[in-house]
């Protein structure tokens, strides 16, 4: 009688992603609905309803934040993540009358979100009043 143990069942080796991996960062119900439609099988989804913590975001080729309007804190946190990891990032915001996509931030090649926001305000942009933001959120 043999006392050797049988080999463990063969497990399939983890597969490398077939293309670029996107980290989707949704904030709110609208964002989660959008991300459900956009995310591919290799992409990761990390909800940021309570803030963006970079250690919770796995490494990816790019990041997309989908959020309510004027989430400057989230956008600045995304900038920090983008520049620290050297990955492009994009923001998508739902306003009452429009859907705003951008800016695309490419570390070392384009302006950061803070610079974009400062320039936008210089030309007359005003954030939504707090009561409108509260009604949307």
Which stretches of residues belong to each language-model region?
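Adenine nucleotide-associated cytosolic modules
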Residues: 1-137
């Amino acid at each position: 009688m043999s006392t050797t143990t049988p080999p463990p069942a063969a497990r399939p080796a983890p597969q490398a992603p077939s293309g670029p991996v996107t980290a989707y960062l949704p904030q709110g119900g609208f964002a989660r609905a959008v991300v459900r439609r956009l995310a591919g099988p290799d992409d990761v989804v990390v909800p940021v309803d309570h803030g963006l913590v970079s250690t919770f975001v796995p490494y990816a080729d790019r990041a997309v934040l989908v959020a309510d309007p004027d989430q400057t804190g989230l956008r600045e946190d995304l900038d920090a993540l983008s520049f620290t990891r050297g990955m492009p990032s994009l923001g998508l915001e739902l306003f009452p009358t429009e859907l705003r996509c951008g800016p695309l931030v490419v570390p070392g090649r384009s302006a950061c979100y803070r610079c974009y926001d400062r320039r936008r305000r210089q030309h007359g942009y005003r954030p939504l009043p707090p009561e409108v933001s509260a009604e949307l959120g």
